[in-house]
């Protein structure tokens, strides 16, 4: 007798990508319940950072402190399970992706299209981040200031 079961279809997403999409769906459900409060977003970011590997956690903590001090108008929230900082419209401006999220050898500081980083016809929107230093902090401050300008 012929096999009538349908073989599993590959959707092209890795397990990590599917997990991130599930995290985002949960975030959207939580935001829809009585509206997300700034305190809820902050706690979600802190919880996200706490779950990271020690090296990533140290970077994420520095990014968090630097972004919130540089642009206090940005609201902390999680975005696909990652620490992110959104404008008053709730649109993510800047986010931190830890190296463990998708198995990369570096963490990423990324900016969405709401960030004002335009510089000619081409400009970077993501930065590999391996270690924190005074020079890195200065560059992050400059990028965040430009992003919210």
Spans of features found by a protein language model:
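Charge-dense, helix-prone N-terminal extensions
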Residues: 1-149
């Amino acid at each position: 007798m012929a096999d009538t079961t349908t073989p599993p279809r590959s959707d092209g997403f890795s397990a990590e990508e599917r997990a991130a999409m599930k995290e985002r769906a949960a975030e959207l459900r939580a935001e829809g319940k009585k509206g997300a409060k700034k305190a809820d977003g902050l706690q979600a970011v802190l919880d996200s950072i706490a779950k990271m590997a020690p090296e990533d956690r140290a970077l994420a903590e520095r990014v968090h402190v630097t972004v919130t001090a540089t642009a206090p108008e940005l609201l902390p929230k999680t975005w696909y399970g990652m620490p992110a900082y959104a404008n008053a419209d709730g649109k993510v401006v800047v986010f931190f992706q830890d190296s463990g999220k998708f198995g990369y050898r570096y963490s990423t500081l990324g900016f969405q299209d709401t960030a004002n980083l335009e510089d000619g016809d081409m400009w970077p929107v993501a930065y590999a981040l391996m270690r924190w230093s005074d020079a890195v902090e200065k560059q992050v401050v400059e990028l965040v200031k430009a992003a919210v300008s």
